[in-house]
Structures are given as structure tokens and as C-alpha cells.
């Protein structure tokens, strides 16, 4: 289990590459009736039930971001995910991969990393430094490693996932 946590701490998982404009556009184009995927909801519930946390954010698909992201918009916290990206990752590895990605994004919310995207767009909040971004990614990775270990993921599950993720991203 310690090796799994260490591996997940060393290899950055997700959250590279989304610009605030892409995320804002995705959220703005969604209606207030978010449609989600039951498989993603079930995976998220599995993560939250395992750590005893309540769901205080919205899980919503957001096509063409080729990733997943934790953010907030107009005071509501979201986890956005690209269904095709998640399917691609899972097709090349296993179900642990989507759990790890979602756990990483939950980690951003749990650790207080998500700031309202409108504040960034309006330049009310200063963009984080590279050092701060890396620190936050490691904190989210640590949380994901903790969750995955509690759910019973093996070191081989983590290795398979990280090998594919590095090729895809």
C-alpha cells in the first residue's frame, strides 16, 4: 500500500492543460439541468462513501477538455470530466484508472484548491505560481493514492494506469 501511495505521489495524474476559458465555456454552455453518466456517479459515490464524505459538488461531463478538472463556478463546486477521455483511459487500463482520476479531482476540492473560475477570468484572483500548482497537484495525488489504497488498488493497477496516462496526456 505504501508503494502505491508513493507511486501516485511521484507521477502527476491530471489537471494539466485546461485553460480558464475552456472551463468557463464548458460550464456556461451547460444548462442548470446537468446530465451525468451513471458510471461516473457510481465511481464518485464509491470514493466518497469510502472516506465518509458527503457530495457537495456537481459531477458533469464536459466534452473536448481531454481530462478532468475540479473547479467552481458562481459559487457551485464542480468536477468536470471528458467522457471520451475517461473511456480511452479505461479501455487501455482498467476501472481503477477512472477512480484514480476522480479521486484526484475530489482531492482538489477536499484540499480547498478550487477557486471560482469567474474570479480568475476577471483577474480578481491571481493565477497560481508553478510551484504552488505543483504543490496542489501533489496534494491531490496524495489524496488519490490514499483513496485508491483504501479501495484495494494494487501497485500493478497504479503502474498500468500511470503508464497509459503518460502516453495519453
Region spans (language model):
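A Zn2+-metalloprotease active-site environment signal
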Residues: 18-169
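Sec-dependent N-terminal signal peptides
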Residues: 3-13, 17
Amino acid at each position: 500500500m505504501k508503494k502505491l501511495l508513493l507511486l501516485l505521489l511521484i507521477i502527476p495524474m491530471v489537471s494539466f492543460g485546461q485553460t480558464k476559458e475552456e472551463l468557463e465555456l464548458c460550464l456556461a454552455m451547460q444548462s442548470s439541468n446537468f446530465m451525468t453518466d451513471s458510471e461516473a456517479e457510481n465511481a464518485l459515490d464509491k470514493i466518497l462513501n469510502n472516506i465518509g464524505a458527503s457530495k457537495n459538488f456537481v459531477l458533469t461531463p464536459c466534452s473536448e477538455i481531454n481530462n478532468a478538472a475540479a473547479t467552481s463556478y458562481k459559487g457551485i463546486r464542480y468536477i468536470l470530466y471528458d467522457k471520451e477521455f475517461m473511456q480511452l483511459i479505461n479501455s487501455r487500463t482498467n476501472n481503477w484508472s477512472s477512480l484514480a482520476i476522480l479521486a484526484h479531482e475530489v482531492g482538489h476540492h477536499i484540499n480547498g484548491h478550487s477557486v471560482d473560475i469567474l474570479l480568475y477570468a476577471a483577474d480578481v484572483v491571481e493565477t497560481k505560481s508553478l510551484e504552488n500548482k505543483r504543490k496542489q497537484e501533489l496534494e491531490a495525488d496524495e489524496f488519490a493514492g490514499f483513496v485508491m489504497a483504501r479501495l484495494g488498488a494494487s501497485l500493478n493497477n497504479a503502474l498500468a494506469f500511470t503508464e497509459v496516462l503518460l502516453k495519453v496526456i
